[in-house]
Design a protein with these regions (language model features):
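Non-catalytic, C-terminal membrane-associated alpha-helical segments of glycosyltransferases
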Residues: 50-58, 68-120
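A short, conserved alpha-helix in the catalytic core of glycosyltransferases
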Residues: 2-31
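Short alpha-helical functional segments enriched in proximate histidine and acidic residues
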Residues: 62-63
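A broad structural signal for alpha-helix termini and local helix breaks/kinks
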Residues: 43, 66-67
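Residue-level recognition of short, structured coil/turn motifs
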Residues: 22, 67-68
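Nucleotide-sugar-dependent glycosyltransferase catalytic core
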Residues: 5, 33-57
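Residues in flexible loops and secondary-structure boundaries
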Residues: 8, 12-14, 35, 40, ...
Length: 120
């Protein structure tokens, strides 16, 4: 599913395999090597934003796909005003990584909300 960035694609794949009554074998010794090397984003704040934004969006989207998103969405929706406040306060206190963290989660929630409202 192209809506996943990275974090929940394995869960989605396993869920679809199990749905088709197939088995999944986990090999603990297996290793994967990324051909492109290191992360291309060098800016520390961008890394924080990208990681938390995509993780939050992927989590919400995965639970939406399995029709189990209502509780996750409700809990995050309650936190959004606090996240906005914390983002602003941390920005003024020059705790930029914390500010970016809360901003990324807020933005992911709004993107997810936009997606599900478009699908209604």
């Amino acid at each position: 599913d192209e809506n996943f960035f990275l974090y929940y694609s394995d869960f989605d794949l396993c869920r679809r395999i199990l749905k088709k009554k197939k088995t999944i074998i986990q090999i603990f010794e297996a290793k994967a090597q990324h051909d492109h090397g290191e992360i291309k984003v060098k800016n520390f704040l961008k890394k924080i934003f990208i990681r938390n934004y995509n993780f939050t969006f992927d989590e919400l989207y995965y639970f939406f796909k399995i029709n189990n998103h209502h509780e996750k969405t409700r809990r995050l929706k309650k936190k959004i005003p606090k996240y906005i406040t914390k983002s602003i306060i941390n920005l003024f206190l020059l705790r930029l990584s914390q500010s970016v963290y809360y901003f990324s989660k807020t933005l992911a929630f709004y993107r997810f909300n936009k997606l599900i409202n478009k699908n209604k």
